[in-house]
Amino acid sequence: MKYKSLFLTSCILAIVFSSCKKCYRQNGFPSETRTGANTFGGYVDKIEFLPCKTTGGISPVKKLEASSYHGYGYAENYVDFGILAVNDCDKHYTYGRSISIQFDSMEIETNKTYKFGSRSDNSKNKVTCQYSQDLVDYNSDSTLSGSITVTYYDNSKKIMSGKFEATLKRRDGPETVNITTGVFDVTF
């Protein structure tokens, strides 16, 4: 009986502590750097977006993630590359916000500008952008304005830096959002 109550108390404490929320926020809007500082920022319809992740719960997603994959059969310089920035600390949004940028089988080069395309386009060699706010998705499209400039890319050091701007369209409606002054400096 004593072990049963000890086990029950341990379970309750584990649940309480795992649901505690502490916010890990980036310090201020980032400047343009090329050092792999793991910073990200932008303005969505003139509202600042910075990565911020609460701890607790069971979500494995970090506030800022970047990854690269060299697919089988790809030419040597072609990679899949993704950046995901999450903000679930802002109390104005029930389910939080996120920005995702995806290079799909691209040859990434320093000081090159890429136009955003459509996520629904099944072709390779494209770059896409998505903004999610309270479970509503806004996506890049080749008919809308938007581009990303890679200001620094070093696959051996695993660093990518750049800036971006885009007009994104709601997936199931006519509404749009504008992302301006987007900057990032990430390691992968």
Description of each model-found segment:
Residues 52-53:
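Short linear motifs in exposed loops
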Residues 44, 85-89, 166-172:
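Short acidic, glycine-rich loop/turn motifs
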Residues 21-28:
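Bacterial lipoprotein signal-peptidase II cleavage site
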Residues 34-36, 142-144, 178:
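Residues that act as N-cap/strand-start positions at coil-to-secondary-structure junctions
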Residues 145-188:
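C-terminal or internal capping secondary-structure element at the end of a domain, subdomain, or sheet
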Residues 57-155:
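Surface-exposed helix/loop patches within compact recognition domains
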